[in-house]
Amino acid sequence: MHTTTRTLTQHKRIALVAHDSCKKNLLNWTQKHKEALKPHILYATGTTGHILERETGLSIQSLLSGPMGGDQQLGGLIAEKKIDMMIFFWDPMNAAPHDPDVKALMRIATVWNIPVAINQSSADFLLTSVLFEQDVEIDVPDYEGYLKERLA
C-alpha cells in the first residue's frame, strides 16, 4: 500500500486505555504526568475515562466502556485520524472477554501508524520524547490512492 503523510500537531489527541487490573497503574501514571497532559485533548474508554477525570481533574472525552464498544469507537477515531497517540496499559496475564476488540484496536493503531505505549515504561518514553511537544510528520496509508486502485 502506498503512503502519504499526516501531521501530529504539538497539541496531541491522546487515547488513554487500561484493562481493569491496570486502571490504578494508569491513574497513577496520569497523576504523575498531569501537567504534561493538560494541554492535550484526552480520550478514554468509559470506566477509565470517568476514573481519570474524577481523580485528576483533567478534561477527558469518555467513550463507551471497552467491552461495550468503546474499543471499537476508539478504533474508528484512529481510522478517521482523530487520535494521534494511544497509551494502553493492558494486562498480558489475564484474558478479557473483549480480547478480539483489543486486537482490532491494536491492529488499527498499527495500520494508521500512531505511537502506542503498552506499559508505564513505554508511556514515559513517549511523553518525554522531544517529539511529544512539537509537530511531527508520520507516514499513513494513502486511503484515497487505495480506494482508486480498488475501484479501477
UniProtKB/Swiss-Prot annotation:
GO terms for cellular component: cytosol. Keywords: Lyase. Its EC number is 4.2.3.3. GO terms for biological process: methylglyoxal biosynthetic process. InterPro entries: Methylgl_synth, Methylglyoxal_synth_AS, MGS-like_dom, MGS-like_dom_sf. Transmembrane segments: none annotated. The active site is at 71 (proton donor/acceptor). It catalyses: dihydroxyacetone phosphate = methylglyoxal + phosphate. Gene3D superfamilies: Methylglyoxal synthase-like domain. Residues 6-152 form the MGS-like domain. Substrate binds at residues 19, 23, 45-48, 65-66, 98. GO terms for molecular function: methylglyoxal synthase activity. Belongs to the methylglyoxal synthase family. Catalyzes the formation of methylglyoxal from dihydroxyacetone phosphate. This is Methylglyoxal synthase. It comes from Haemophilus influenzae (strain PittGG).
